[in-house]
Amino acid sequence: MRHKIKGRKLNVTSSHRQAMLANMAVALVTHEQIKTTLPKAKELRPYIETLITKAKKADLMVRRSVLSKIKDKTAVEKLINILGTRYKDRPGGYTRIIKAGFRYGDLAPIAYIEFVDRDINAKGNIQQDANEEIKN
């Protein structure tokens, strides 16, 4: 029975899953929007939201705690200095998941995960990305 077992296995080992979530968190903090499969986006959401909730406090212990999770100093700086202050008054719900159809090769459900109130200049909008993929 799976009582009280949360999370998805994503068909990888636990160390691979932890590294993948950390790398996806760095990409999301850097670009403020990433395209991935729907189950990975659903797993990334609570992971990144706890990091942002910690980053809102912005002291040395929080910095070390976040750095132990994502291991990228520039992403930690942006998380604490920019995103922590941006979402200071928001009690949660920092990300949104937008379903974006299915991948051509294996029909995996694709989704965009992005920050609410994100900086549009950090990465292009969804329509512009879709037009570039069609051209290539």
From Swiss-Prot:
Subunit structure: Part of the 50S ribosomal subunit. Contacts protein L32.
Name of the encoding gene: rplQ
Name recorded for this polypeptide: Large ribosomal subunit protein bL17
Keywords from the UniProt entry: Ribonucleoprotein, Ribosomal protein
Gene Ontology terms describing biological process: translation
Assigned GO CC terms: cytosolic large ribosomal subunit
One function term, GO molecular function aspect: structural constituent of ribosome
Zinc-finger is among the record's keywords: no
Any Pfam family hit: Ribosomal_L17
UniProt keyword Cell wall biogenesis/degradation, yes or no: no
Classification via PANTHER family: LARGE RIBOSOMAL SUBUNIT PROTEIN BL17M (PTHR14413:SF16), RIBOSOMAL PROTEIN L17 (PTHR14413)
Family according to the record: Belongs to the bacterial ribosomal protein bL17 family.
